[in-house]
Curated annotation (Swiss-Prot):
Lineage: Bacteria, Pseudomonadati, Pseudomonadota, Gammaproteobacteria, Enterobacterales
InterPro entries: AAA+_ATPase, DNA_recomb/repair_RecA, DNA_recomb/repair_RecA_CS, P-loop_NTPase, RecA-like_C, RecA-like_N, RecA_ATP-bd, RecA_C_sf
Descriptive protein name: Protein RecA
NCBIfam families: tigrfam_recA (TIGR02012)
Annotated segments matching region Disordered: 334-357
A GO biological-process term: SOS response
Organism annotation: Pectobacterium atrosepticum (strain SCRI 1043 / ATCC BAA-672)
Keyword RNA-binding carried by entry: no
Gene, per the UniProt record: recA
Family under the similarity heading: Belongs to the RecA family.
Length: 357
């Protein structure tokens, strides 16, 4: 239906005034192309990038990564930092747990000389530092480890045993309101690592919940549930862990997909193992008995040897990675303006099917 000409003129004048006052892009039509492109940073895991649909974690958004202890939360975020630094981006790590190991970070490919690090005394201080870094417009990725360690100032100054009901939740709620707009303007990715707690007296459904109240769940564009599903052994020695990540909320692509990969101790995500597995699954790598072949050339007998070949030949690894991304980041992952139910959590939509990569 055509809009009245006078109304069109009035609308154009209003839009012009808004853009003049608040900047270009402060208001736009939803169908415009520029609003649909989402810049992303790789997670360091090919299968997780594919499960996320957009090819990685979205810039200018809030992301929550949660899971049990020793499930790989910090390792995953350090891999994100390493990937961002390789693209020349500036990263900051807010270490509220005071537990960041620079030697381990360096092993995962993090340039520790150029990583900004803060160990704040209180939760308010940590969130103020986040806000200041965001408003500077010079920091591309900020990690907060973890929400559970963001202790309000009143709790630190009080006695052990004092009741501070809802204090952390109020602090997080206020911070989310303040940070969300600034992150979008600065195009900064903010990742919160969170821990799991059990709800008491839950007879039916999932008793697990995350700390810090509900605000983070609502403001996060992506929520990842990371779990350790098994151990990787060489003989009797445990050398890593099998890991599964579920995308329980996704505002930039289809949710409810999951990725499985290996985390090797001292090395991080086994990207070459993912390339072999996905290559075989999607017929880019041929497997005959124990032998693996790529483009007709044998690359190794057994998965370990095939992985070593890819590790020693980065050009072939990059070529295989590119082919898999082009093949698997397909039409179904494109943003749709009216994707109903796209941002709900897994808890709310129990029984949804998950696509695995």
């Amino acid at each position: 239906m055509a809009i009245d000409e006078n109304k069109q003129k009035a609308l154009a004048a209003a839009l012009g005034q808004i853009e003049k006052q608040f900047g270009k892009g402060s208001i736009m039509r939803l169908g415009e192309d520029r609003s649909m492109d989402v810049e992303t940073i790789s997670t360091g895991s090919l299968s997780l990038d594919i499960a996320l649909g957009a090819g990685g974690l979205p810039m200018g958004r809030i992301v929550e990564i949660y899971g049990p202890e020793s499930s790989g939360k910090t390792t995953l975020t350090l891999q994100v930092i390493a990937a961002a630094q390789r693209e020349g981006k500036t990263c900051a790590f807010i270490d509220a747990e005071h537990a960041l190991d620079p030697i381990y970070a360096k092993k995962l490919g993090v340039d520790i000389d150029n990583l900004l690090c803060s160990q704040p005394d209180t939760g308010e201080q940590a969130l103020e530092i986040c806000d200041a870094l965001t408003r500077s417009g010079a920091v591309d990725v900020i990690i907060v480890d973890s929400v559970a360690a963001l202790t309000p100032k009143a709790e630190i100054e009080g006695e052990i045993g004092d009741s501070h009901m809802g204090l952390a939740a109020r602090m997080m709620s206020q911070a989310m309101r303040k940070l969300a707009g600034n992150l979008k303007q600065a195009n900064t990715l903010l990742i919160f690592i969170n821990q799991i707690r059990m709800k008491i007296g839950v007879m039916f459904g999932n008793p697990e919940t995350t700390t810090g109240g509900n605000a983070l769940k609502f403001y996060a564009s992506v929520r990842l549930d990371i779990r350790r599903t098994g151990a990787i052994k060489e003989g009797e020695e445990v050398v890593g862990s099998e890991t599964r990540v579920k995308v329980v909320k996704n505002k930039v692509a289809a949710p409810f997909k999951q990725a499985e990969f290996q985390i090797l101790y001292g090395e991080g995500i086994n990207i070459h193992g993912e390339l072999v597995d996905l290559g075989v699954k999607h017929k880019l790598i041929e497997k005959a008995g124990a032998w693996y072949s790529y483009n007709g050339d044998k690359i190794g007998q057994g998965k370990a040897n095939a992985c070593n070949f890819l590790k020693e030949n980065p050009t072939i690894s990059a070529e295989l990675d590119k082919k898999l991304r082009e093949m698997l980041l397909h039409k179904g992952n494109e943003l749709k303006p009216a994707a109903a139910g796209n941002s709900h959590d897994e808890d709310e939509l129990a029984g949804e099917g998950k696509e695995e990569f």
